[in-house]
């Protein structure tokens, strides 16, 4: 055969191979397109599978608790016979078993799983449904446990979402819960919130007349004397704001204009002054003010600029939502209860945009909240630009379907395969700081470490690989966060492997931390607000499979998940660098590494001129006291669940010299549901609900007292006491972890309006709050130290202020807050309805939601057949969830 013939044959072979490859790729894409049209239905079968024949312990379920779920995939198109496919999905619960031998499910990382066919797979027949029963760990008590945007892949085809899961409307693919599927145990004493049970719950609330709210300020001042006359703001206000820097003065003027009170020279005069010498004793603190509102003018005297700003916010608090323009004349003396009144926002798990952050800061300022704890990094995302380390945002700032994770992190939390994410540029972050500074808010940046660091670890590995390939070995290792000798088998709280933890024993880890602190500190300086507090993070540096809910198969204990714990390691256990440090006596053991690292980071913090470090308390648990750290002050976010012993352990931290910022999950975690109803959003490991009333009733400076006013996770009473001294809390912070909020409106729904209850409790100590007494035991349902009548009266006032006045202001601020679902019943053929925040409008429908009518409690409508109810925002633009009575 001559050369020409060989060449022609080679070209023909190559062409056929190319065409074959094209054909294969087209076939893969066709298969993915077909799979994307499968309709998913998720149905909860049994949240207490262990009581009904499933051996959860043998399956290795934490605390031997598991549930059963049914996945149904319906095929309305042509038969699908191909086996070379994967469907990816997200779940906060570990899959323990698949009860259909045609399918298998494997865990990838975090909440990402893949569903694949086995050799026994017989296809998805045309016009038929295939059922896949699954056993998963724990419980799935709220429908948001079932995440959207399942997606299919095959070969090199472009991934594609299952169409009916590409939504935030869970009704499209998650079946309603039925019966007692919402219960965690058969003895669960929580009350399922329905229109009927809400009607009972709201029975002690009524709409107060406007006169009863006259002169009421939120948050409540220390002392107020309301006078008979009114001040008229209908011609606007003439503001003397010379005591404030211009950005703060502009904020005040803009707030008046937003609420319908124009700023003009012929308006009602409001004068301001700063006289620190006028304030004595407990009043001589930042933010204190005196306010005199007369018929002809008002005067605000502040201890400092913050005091002037807050006094003006108190005037704004009085402005009615109906635009009438008249406010009560009064005298007030006021000062904050705590120096730290905070909101924590996680933008790492799911990113939230700059505009949403600014709206949050607006509302924080209006309600005198002064600390913005900004969670900028976690396993699932890195959200701030760091000059010199572009990989942090190029890789760690976005998620997509890249199994190698060289261009992005893998998808999490139901986002789908497409590129998702975002980050704050250097200028964005400076803008946010300036915006906060103008509103008397300190920005506290948090870069979480040594655990919850996967985004940083993966990003720095991408950097390492790139520079290593270029032969720049020294530069490649400069900021590397892993010890390549470490083969530890660990599982983090949210099911990541050892990549979740940066290695605290490496010099390169310290260089990385120093670099990040330095760059962020420089941004703060340029913004005019030098960092006062650096947040170290520090939480959850552990292997959950070595936790109390698991037991080793060699000596199994009842009530626990049985696993082979001999294969489990503590974080960094097999790191040769860490092993050497322990041998040299630099640290006692692996358990002490997080606290050791916190001490080392505190030296870097101090070197950057930052006087205070803060952390989640478990990250510092092995340090002897706050004096073990280089900074002169150390704060802890105390997040022990109160009914599991937090009422006592909190004292230990205060007595060791830490500034305790009360952050208890069961009261002030705003990522938990508002009520016990499967249609609400949120995680619920600490409590099944935290509504505005529960947060309002929280006593942050006397933890045991809360046993009389609340229940545990299962709705049971509990007892609480501590025999230890209690020096007092430094502050109160409400947290929004963002795993369950993929959009900005979802974020705002979870924060507001309960953040207003946080503002009330952090600024004002109520008369019904008891002084802490060592040794006093509060027994839920038995003791009655708390004046519950005073508490209920106080809540009635506050609930009416929210419903009649403050929610309308949130409307004007563009905030997508949660509207409560009404309580309702039909009695003698007439609809009776009520609401948790009196003053909000209620609507009802008798035709399946096609038409809605306003409910009038004074003329209860006659109804028959199916009736639905919902509440409506004061501006008439938004509605609560509608429910059948």
Swiss-Prot record:
Pathway: Glycan degradation; chitin degradation
Coiled-coil residue windows: none
Transmembrane feature ranges: none
Basic and acidic residues bias (residue ranges): 875-885
Region (Disordered): 866-885
SUPFAM superfamilies given in the database record: (Trans)glycosidases, beta-N-acetylhexosaminidase-like domain, Carbohydrate-binding domain, E set domains
Subcellular location: Periplasm
Record key words, sorted: Carbohydrate metabolism, Chitin degradation, Disulfide bond, Glycosidase, Hydrolase, Periplasm, Polysaccharide degradation, Signal
A Gene Ontology cellular-component term: periplasmic space
Chief subcellular location: periplasm
Keyword Signal listed: yes
Enzyme Commission numbers on file: 3.2.1.52
Gene Ontology biological-process entries: chitin catabolic process; glycosaminoglycan metabolic process; polysaccharide catabolic process
Molecular functions (GO terms): beta-N-acetylhexosaminidase activity; polysaccharide binding
Disulfide bonds: 56-66, 400-408, 505-578
EC class of the enzyme, as a word: hydrolase
Catalyzed chemical reaction(s): Hydrolysis of terminal non-reducing N-acetyl-D-hexosamine residues in N-acetyl-beta-D-hexosaminides
Subunit structure: Monomer.
PANTHER family hit by this protein: BETA-HEXOSAMINIDASE (PTHR22600), BETA-N-ACETYLHEXOSAMINIDASE (PTHR22600:SF57)
UniProt family annotation: Belongs to the glycosyl hydrolase 20 family.
Stated name of the protein: Chitobiase
Underlying gene: chb
